[in-house]
Amino acid sequence: GQALSVNHGEVVTDGGRRLQADLLVLAISHPPPSLPSLATPFATHPALIANPWRAGVLATIAPEASVAVMGTGLTMADTVATLTRLGHRGPIAAFSRRGLLSRSNLSGSSEPWPGEYDRGTLRQRLRQIRLDIERAAEQGQAWQVVLDAVRNQGQSIWQGLTVADRQRFLRHLRSYWDVHRYRIAPQVAGVLEQRQRDGSLRVLAARLTALEGDAQKLALTLAPRRCETLRVSADHFILTTGPAHGGLTDSQPLLRQLSQRGLIRADAFGLGLDVDRRSRAIGREGRITPNLLVSGPAARAYFGELMGLPQVADHAAAVADEALRTLGVKQSARCPAF
């Protein structure tokens, strides 16, 4: 069941179970998307699809229905590909502030790129990455091999940046990094390209400025960059904006209770929870909560790259070691390595 609270080493679940624990690990993944404020009055409107992953929800969309999609990243790409597979051919308008699409992954394998990017300022590292992309092209290699090398060094790169450079990255570069880091399969990219070519998919750099609706449809007012206001009428409005990491501490009862007690707090970058180098939670006034560890993407404000399976698995192993040390379990008493 879902954990609701923890007090004096006792975890209470929604099923009424009470579990005794000397140490608690928050191995949480991503929080659900948050509803945009303009969409809140339409939370129960039949045209609004706030969770495109809900079983069978995309199958309810008629083949010729008009669709608006907020967000242009991975979830949008998967949504459009799924709709297309289900026979949808109606008009789709997808929008985000920058209108950036996730790039296509390489098909097949490639040699690892030897670049190193763990020194210098953000600007210096960015310059080196761009130079290496040019070098790779001269050698007949794609930019993806360079970005894979950057991803593999993501934790050391992030931890080596100053706070100011981390903030600059999040403010100016994060959107561009995300569409190159979180890539889509070539087959999905092909679907998007085909639908753009036949005119059934428009991708816009725009903000949602107003939302109205009647009994069946929703009407979106969009403000494109450097263009006049645009009005889009949609039989369905799908939200694909991704997890609401900035609201993690309020996303479920246990985290809300821990936050209210001052045992955890959101990190300064809005990426998840504040932790120290040992993955221990940091709470109110910067106090460490020694018997509360955080594993996985919620700890990425300190560690950096913690989204891919290899990085998450390595971090989980490190958190397990920290838990055993905290509990005083001797090396000889631990499970043997496989």
Please place each PLM-identified region on the residue numbering.
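Flavin (primarily FAD) cofactor-binding/catalytic cores of flavoenzymes
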Residues: 1-120, 127-329, 338
